[in-house]
Amino acid sequence: MVRVKICGLTCEEDVHAAAGYGAHAVGFVFEPSSPRYIGDRADVLELLRSVPPFVVRVAVFGSLRDLPADLWREVDAVQFVSGKAIALPLHLRRIRAVRLRTEEDVRHALRLQDEADALLVDAYHPQKMGGTGETANWRLARLLRDEATKPVILAGGLTPDNVCDAIAQVQPFAVDVSSGVESAPGKKDHLKVKEFIANVRRFADGS
């Protein structure tokens, strides 16, 4: 089955909904420019610790930056657009986000594989680094998926309505959704979360 990450979580209720409906991973944004930023909250450790066992906790950055040691201990993977991951704690998996507009971008993404455990394809935006609601280029994502030696995760404009088409075209290792299951930036619509995950499962079952 294609795995599911629900990204941009900001409260325990949304964490419990995502995990309860079957998300394999949840994302927490540590990029200050994002409306889903949680890095300055007093309860950030409690939020990270609210994730149930066997659900992967992903810290999401635009430009990679350091976090206090107590925060690093509470996450399992780091996702970033730019910056080297060489100083990260050894237990962290590294997800390199790439934005594809041309086949040259695909070739560049392939060269980044050595510094990542997975590649995440997101939609290109000139000012923003994710969570825009714009759809990624599925043709280029499939090209990357076919050539990559590391798992490819598809993000960018996914919704309950289009996720099955996206999986059929790209055949990714996982899908990643944020704005496509929200009622407002940073606030998840639990019915949309449920529908998104259910649709991925139905696709996997061939129904």
Task: Map each language-model feature to its residues.
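Conserved N-terminal beta1-alpha1 strand-loop-helix module at the mouth
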Residues: 1-207
